[in-house]
Amino acid sequence: MSISNDSLASTVPGDELPSSYPVFSSDFSYIKPSHVLDVVTVTSTAGPEATDDPSYSGFYSTVISTQNPEPTSASTPPSASASSLPNGAQKHNHTGVIAGPIVGVLGGLIVLVIIFYCLRHFKRKKFLAEQQEFERQFEEEKSRLAAVRKNTEQEKMGYRGGYQMHSTPWASSPRNSTIPQRSQSFYNDTRRSSDLGANAADFVTPPGNVANSDNIRILKRNSIATIGNYRSPSALEKRRSISYGAVQSVQGRPLAPIPGRRPLSISSDLYNDSNSGSHSNDDSDETKLKQSSTESSSELLDEKDKFDKNSLNDPFVTIRKSSYEHEISEEHKKHSKKRSEHF
Protein backbone atom coordinates (compact mmCIF):
# COMPACT_ATOMS: atom_id res chain seq x y z
CA MET A 1 0.00 0.00 0.00
CA SER A 2 1.24 3.45 -0.81
CA ILE A 3 1.01 6.66 1.18
CA SER A 4 -0.51 9.48 -0.81
CA ASN A 5 0.38 13.17 -0.57
CA ASP A 6 -2.94 14.05 0.98
CA SER A 7 -2.76 11.39 3.61
CA LEU A 8 0.82 12.44 4.63
CA ALA A 9 -0.21 16.08 4.73
CA SER A 10 -2.47 15.24 7.60
CA THR A 11 0.60 14.54 9.75
CA VAL A 12 1.08 18.27 10.28
CA PRO A 13 0.81 19.10 14.02
CA GLY A 14 -2.76 19.71 14.98
CA ASP A 15 -4.13 17.02 12.68
CA GLU A 16 -4.47 13.38 13.63
CA LEU A 17 -4.38 10.34 11.45
CA PRO A 18 -7.41 8.06 11.42
CA SER A 19 -6.82 5.14 13.75
CA SER A 20 -7.71 2.55 11.11
CA TYR A 21 -5.23 3.88 8.54
CA PRO A 22 -2.01 1.78 8.28
CA VAL A 23 0.90 4.22 8.30
CA PHE A 24 3.67 1.66 7.81
CA SER A 25 3.79 -1.17 5.39
CA SER A 26 6.43 -3.43 3.92
CA ASP A 27 6.34 -1.81 0.45
CA PHE A 28 7.27 1.74 1.55
CA SER A 29 6.89 4.59 -0.94
CA TYR A 30 5.79 8.19 -0.60
CA ILE A 31 5.89 11.52 -2.41
CA LYS A 32 7.87 14.22 -0.51
CA PRO A 33 5.74 17.34 -0.04
CA SER A 34 7.13 20.79 -0.76
CA HIS A 35 6.78 22.15 2.79
CA VAL A 36 9.05 19.48 4.35
CA LEU A 37 12.63 20.76 4.28
CA ASP A 38 15.24 18.30 5.48
CA VAL A 39 14.33 14.85 6.61
CA VAL A 40 11.38 12.60 7.02
CA THR A 41 12.85 9.39 8.34
CA VAL A 42 10.61 6.41 8.77
CA THR A 43 12.36 3.46 10.35
CA SER A 44 10.71 0.05 10.15
CA THR A 45 12.50 -2.60 12.16
CA ALA A 46 11.57 -6.22 12.68
CA GLY A 47 11.11 -7.57 16.16
CA PRO A 48 13.48 -9.84 18.05
CA GLU A 49 11.65 -12.97 16.82
CA ALA A 50 11.10 -12.06 13.21
CA THR A 51 8.82 -14.33 11.17
CA ASP A 52 6.96 -13.96 7.96
CA ASP A 53 3.89 -13.00 9.88
CA PRO A 54 2.87 -9.47 8.78
CA SER A 55 1.60 -8.72 12.27
CA TYR A 56 5.23 -8.30 13.50
CA SER A 57 6.24 -5.85 10.77
CA GLY A 58 5.80 -2.64 12.80
CA PHE A 59 7.55 -3.47 16.07
CA TYR A 60 9.68 -0.26 16.34
CA SER A 61 8.76 2.96 14.50
CA THR A 62 10.27 6.49 14.55
CA VAL A 63 9.09 9.51 12.60
CA ILE A 64 11.27 12.68 12.52
CA SER A 65 9.97 15.62 10.59
CA THR A 66 11.48 19.11 10.22
CA GLN A 67 9.39 21.87 8.81
CA ASN A 68 10.55 24.98 7.00
CA PRO A 69 8.50 28.20 7.44
CA GLU A 70 9.58 29.32 3.95
CA PRO A 71 9.20 26.32 1.68
CA THR A 72 11.72 26.08 -1.13
CA SER A 73 11.88 23.81 -4.12
CA ALA A 74 12.49 20.20 -3.31
CA SER A 75 15.19 19.96 -5.98
CA THR A 76 17.55 22.36 -4.07
CA PRO A 77 20.28 20.43 -2.25
CA PRO A 78 20.20 21.27 1.48
CA SER A 79 24.00 21.64 1.79
CA ALA A 80 24.21 24.36 -0.84
CA SER A 81 21.58 26.55 0.81
CA ALA A 82 23.06 26.03 4.30
CA SER A 83 26.69 26.82 3.50
CA SER A 84 26.24 29.69 1.08
CA LEU A 85 27.59 33.04 2.42
CA PRO A 86 26.20 36.45 1.43
CA ASN A 87 29.41 37.43 -0.38
CA GLY A 88 29.51 34.22 -2.31
CA ALA A 89 32.66 32.84 -0.61
CA GLN A 90 32.79 29.30 0.59
CA LYS A 91 33.41 28.72 4.33
CA HIS A 92 36.07 26.03 4.71
CA ASN A 93 37.11 24.49 8.02
CA HIS A 94 40.86 24.87 7.34
CA THR A 95 43.58 24.19 9.99
CA GLY A 96 45.19 27.48 8.94
CA VAL A 97 42.44 29.36 10.72
CA ILE A 98 43.85 28.09 14.05
CA ALA A 99 47.52 27.53 13.17
CA GLY A 100 48.03 30.94 11.56
CA PRO A 101 48.05 33.07 14.77
CA ILE A 102 50.10 30.44 16.61
CA VAL A 103 52.76 30.41 13.90
CA GLY A 104 52.78 34.21 13.86
CA VAL A 105 53.30 34.49 17.63
CA LEU A 106 56.05 31.85 17.60
CA GLY A 107 57.76 33.58 14.70
CA GLY A 108 57.70 36.90 16.54
CA LEU A 109 59.22 35.30 19.63
CA ILE A 110 61.96 33.68 17.57
CA VAL A 111 62.76 37.00 15.92
CA LEU A 112 63.00 38.68 19.36
CA VAL A 113 65.32 35.93 20.64
CA ILE A 114 67.56 36.32 17.60
CA ILE A 115 67.71 40.11 18.07
CA PHE A 116 68.66 39.82 21.75
CA TYR A 117 71.25 37.16 20.98
CA CYS A 118 72.87 39.40 18.37
CA LEU A 119 72.93 42.31 20.83
CA ARG A 120 74.56 40.13 23.49
CA HIS A 121 77.08 38.78 20.99
CA PHE A 122 78.17 42.22 19.84
CA LYS A 123 78.36 43.57 23.40
CA ARG A 124 80.52 40.62 24.48
CA LYS A 125 82.75 41.07 21.46
CA LYS A 126 83.22 44.73 22.36
CA PHE A 127 83.93 43.85 26.00
CA LEU A 128 86.55 41.26 25.01
CA ALA A 129 88.26 43.77 22.75
CA GLU A 130 88.39 46.31 25.59
CA GLN A 131 89.71 43.63 27.96
CA GLN A 132 92.51 42.67 25.60
CA GLU A 133 93.44 46.31 25.16
CA PHE A 134 93.51 46.83 28.91
CA GLU A 135 95.70 43.75 29.44
CA ARG A 136 98.09 44.93 26.75
CA GLN A 137 98.40 48.36 28.36
CA PHE A 138 98.81 46.73 31.78
CA GLU A 139 101.67 44.54 30.56
CA GLU A 140 103.34 47.54 28.93
CA GLU A 141 103.04 49.52 32.16
CA LYS A 142 104.45 46.64 34.19
CA SER A 143 107.44 46.25 31.89
CA ARG A 144 108.02 50.01 31.92
CA LEU A 145 107.90 50.15 35.71
CA ALA A 146 110.24 47.16 35.94
CA ALA A 147 112.73 48.89 33.67
CA VAL A 148 112.50 52.12 35.67
CA ARG A 149 112.95 50.23 38.93
CA LYS A 150 115.93 48.35 37.57
CA ASN A 151 117.60 51.58 36.49
CA THR A 152 116.93 53.49 39.70
CA GLU A 153 117.46 50.69 42.20
CA GLN A 154 120.47 51.06 44.47
CA GLU A 155 122.11 48.56 46.74
CA LYS A 156 120.63 48.84 50.20
CA MET A 157 122.21 47.56 53.38
CA GLY A 158 119.03 46.31 55.00
CA TYR A 159 115.46 45.51 54.19
CA ARG A 160 113.56 48.77 54.29
CA GLY A 161 110.12 47.63 53.34
CA GLY A 162 106.93 47.85 55.27
CA TYR A 163 105.24 45.65 57.79
CA GLN A 164 106.71 42.14 57.83
CA MET A 165 105.88 39.10 59.89
CA HIS A 166 108.60 36.48 60.31
CA SER A 167 107.49 33.02 61.32
CA THR A 168 109.63 29.91 61.34
CA PRO A 169 108.16 27.09 59.29
CA TRP A 170 110.70 24.37 59.87
CA ALA A 171 109.66 22.40 62.94
CA SER A 172 106.17 21.43 61.88
CA SER A 173 104.10 21.86 65.00
CA PRO A 174 101.37 19.32 65.73
CA ARG A 175 97.77 20.36 65.44
CA ASN A 176 96.99 20.00 69.14
CA SER A 177 99.37 22.81 70.02
CA THR A 178 97.90 25.28 67.54
CA ILE A 179 94.36 25.05 68.92
CA PRO A 180 94.01 27.04 72.17
CA GLN A 181 92.26 25.27 75.02
CA ARG A 182 89.60 26.69 77.31
CA SER A 183 91.62 26.33 80.50
CA GLN A 184 93.89 29.11 79.30
CA SER A 185 92.83 32.71 79.35
CA PHE A 186 90.97 33.86 76.27
CA TYR A 187 92.91 37.10 76.06
CA ASN A 188 96.31 35.88 77.23
CA ASP A 189 97.69 32.89 75.40
CA THR A 190 100.45 31.29 77.45
CA ARG A 191 102.30 30.32 74.29
CA ARG A 192 102.80 34.04 73.57
CA SER A 193 104.06 34.95 77.02
CA SER A 194 106.80 37.39 77.97
CA ASP A 195 109.81 35.08 77.46
CA LEU A 196 109.47 35.53 73.70
CA GLY A 197 112.38 33.83 72.02
CA ALA A 198 114.14 32.84 75.24
CA ASN A 199 115.67 29.71 73.74
CA ALA A 200 115.81 30.94 70.16
CA ALA A 201 118.88 32.07 68.24
CA ASP A 202 119.57 35.71 67.52
CA PHE A 203 119.73 35.18 63.77
CA VAL A 204 116.88 33.29 62.17
CA THR A 205 118.28 30.41 60.16
CA PRO A 206 116.75 29.35 56.84
CA PRO A 207 114.16 26.58 56.85
CA GLY A 208 115.37 23.03 56.67
CA ASN A 209 116.33 20.10 58.84
CA VAL A 210 118.39 22.18 61.22
CA ALA A 211 120.05 20.10 63.93
CA ASN A 212 119.50 22.30 66.97
CA SER A 213 117.88 21.83 70.32
CA ASP A 214 114.56 23.17 69.06
CA ASN A 215 113.98 20.12 66.89
CA ILE A 216 114.51 17.83 69.86
CA ARG A 217 111.65 19.60 71.62
CA ILE A 218 109.27 17.92 69.18
CA LEU A 219 109.72 14.64 71.04
CA LYS A 220 108.78 16.28 74.30
CA ARG A 221 105.95 18.28 72.81
CA ASN A 222 104.31 15.26 71.18
CA SER A 223 104.57 13.16 74.30
CA ILE A 224 101.63 12.27 76.51
CA ALA A 225 102.53 14.88 79.11
CA THR A 226 101.77 17.75 76.73
CA ILE A 227 98.27 16.59 75.86
CA GLY A 228 96.92 18.01 79.12
CA ASN A 229 96.25 21.62 79.88
CA TYR A 230 99.58 22.31 81.64
CA ARG A 231 102.17 22.29 78.92
CA SER A 232 105.26 24.43 78.77
CA PRO A 233 105.41 27.01 75.98
CA SER A 234 107.71 25.96 73.18
CA ALA A 235 110.25 28.22 71.52
CA LEU A 236 109.23 27.24 68.00
CA GLU A 237 105.77 28.73 68.19
CA LYS A 238 107.12 31.92 69.64
CA ARG A 239 109.89 32.48 67.16
CA ARG A 240 108.34 35.32 65.27
CA SER A 241 108.99 39.03 65.07
CA ILE A 242 107.53 42.11 63.49
CA SER A 243 109.81 44.48 61.63
CA TYR A 244 109.00 48.03 60.64
CA GLY A 245 111.43 48.92 57.92
CA ALA A 246 114.43 46.78 58.88
CA VAL A 247 115.27 43.12 59.24
CA GLN A 248 115.07 42.21 62.90
CA SER A 249 116.21 39.34 65.00
CA VAL A 250 113.83 37.38 67.19
CA GLN A 251 114.48 39.63 70.15
CA GLY A 252 113.74 42.72 68.04
CA ARG A 253 117.26 43.99 67.38
CA PRO A 254 117.97 45.05 63.79
CA LEU A 255 120.13 42.67 61.80
CA ALA A 256 121.64 45.38 59.61
CA PRO A 257 122.14 49.08 60.18
CA ILE A 258 119.84 51.34 58.25
CA PRO A 259 121.82 53.83 56.15
CA GLY A 260 121.32 57.39 57.19
CA ARG A 261 120.66 56.59 60.85
CA ARG A 262 123.18 56.64 63.63
CA PRO A 263 123.10 53.56 65.86
CA LEU A 264 122.70 54.29 69.55
CA SER A 265 123.76 51.81 72.19
CA ILE A 266 122.39 51.32 75.67
CA SER A 267 125.75 52.07 77.25
CA SER A 268 126.04 55.46 75.58
CA ASP A 269 122.48 56.33 76.60
CA LEU A 270 123.21 55.41 80.20
CA TYR A 271 126.45 57.35 80.10
CA ASN A 272 124.71 60.45 78.75
CA ASP A 273 121.87 60.13 81.26
CA SER A 274 124.32 59.97 84.13
CA ASN A 275 126.17 63.01 82.82
CA SER A 276 123.03 65.04 82.32
CA GLY A 277 121.69 64.10 85.74
CA SER A 278 124.84 65.19 87.56
CA HIS A 279 124.76 68.75 86.22
CA SER A 280 122.41 71.60 86.83
CA ASN A 281 120.10 73.25 84.33
CA ASP A 282 122.72 75.85 83.50
CA ASP A 283 124.90 73.19 81.91
CA SER A 284 122.31 72.02 79.38
CA ASP A 285 124.20 73.39 76.37
CA GLU A 286 127.42 71.72 77.42
CA THR A 287 125.59 68.47 78.15
CA LYS A 288 124.17 68.43 74.65
CA LEU A 289 127.65 68.91 73.20
CA LYS A 290 129.00 66.07 75.33
CA GLN A 291 126.16 63.82 74.27
CA SER A 292 126.73 64.52 70.59
CA SER A 293 130.42 63.75 70.97
CA THR A 294 129.95 60.51 72.90
CA GLU A 295 126.96 58.98 71.11
CA SER A 296 128.87 57.87 68.04
CA SER A 297 132.08 57.02 69.84
CA SER A 298 131.04 55.01 72.88
CA GLU A 299 129.81 52.15 70.69
CA LEU A 300 133.23 51.81 69.08
CA LEU A 301 135.53 52.32 72.06
CA ASP A 302 136.70 49.91 74.70
CA GLU A 303 136.70 50.73 78.36
CA LYS A 304 140.42 51.43 78.43
CA ASP A 305 140.15 53.80 75.47
CA LYS A 306 137.54 56.01 77.07
CA PHE A 307 140.11 57.66 79.31
CA ASP A 308 142.60 58.69 76.64
CA LYS A 309 140.33 59.66 73.75
CA ASN A 310 142.68 62.37 72.54
CA SER A 311 145.46 59.88 71.97
CA LEU A 312 143.56 57.98 69.30
CA ASN A 313 144.94 58.28 65.79
CA ASP A 314 142.40 56.03 64.04
CA PRO A 315 141.04 57.98 61.02
CA PHE A 316 137.69 56.13 61.11
CA VAL A 317 137.00 56.89 64.76
CA THR A 318 137.52 60.63 64.88
CA ILE A 319 136.81 62.32 68.18
CA ARG A 320 137.42 65.97 67.72
CA LYS A 321 138.10 68.23 70.66
CA SER A 322 137.49 71.40 68.71
CA SER A 323 138.55 74.88 69.71
CA TYR A 324 134.88 75.77 70.03
CA GLU A 325 134.49 73.20 72.80
CA HIS A 326 137.64 74.63 74.48
CA GLU A 327 136.14 78.11 74.41
CA ILE A 328 132.85 76.90 75.85
CA SER A 329 134.62 75.03 78.62
CA GLU A 330 136.68 78.14 79.47
CA GLU A 331 133.54 80.28 79.52
CA HIS A 332 131.87 77.72 81.75
CA LYS A 333 134.78 77.86 84.19
CA LYS A 334 134.61 81.65 84.29
CA HIS A 335 130.85 81.55 84.81
CA SER A 336 131.15 79.07 87.67
CA LYS A 337 133.84 81.29 89.30
CA LYS A 338 131.54 84.32 89.04
CA ARG A 339 128.70 82.38 90.63
CA SER A 340 130.90 81.22 93.49
CA GLU A 341 132.10 84.78 94.05
CA HIS A 342 128.52 86.05 93.96
CA PHE A 343 127.36 83.62 96.64
Curated annotation (Swiss-Prot):
* Gene Ontology cellular component list: cell division site; cell tip; Golgi apparatus; Golgi membrane
The answer, when asked if Transmembrane is one of the entry's keywords, is yes
For bias kind Low complexity, which ranges apply? 71-84, 290-299
Q: Where is the composition biased (Polar residues)?
A: 165-188
Task: Enumerate composition-biased segments (Basic residues).
Answer: 334-343
Position of the signal peptide: none
Q: How does it sit in the membrane?
A: Single-pass membrane protein
Where are the residues of the annotated region Disordered?
66-89, 161-191, 252-343
What are the alphabetically sorted keywords of the record? Golgi apparatus, Membrane, Transmembrane, Transmembrane helix
- What are the TM regions of this chain, as residue ranges? 96-116
Superkingdom, natural source: Eukaryota
The protein's location, in the record's own words, is: Golgi apparatus membrane
Residue ranges annotated as compositionally biased, kind Basic and acidic residues, are: 280-289, 301-311, 322-333
Protein name per its UniProtKB record:
Uncharacterized protein C36.11
Per the UniProt record, the source organism is: Schizosaccharomyces pombe (strain 972 / ATCC 24843)
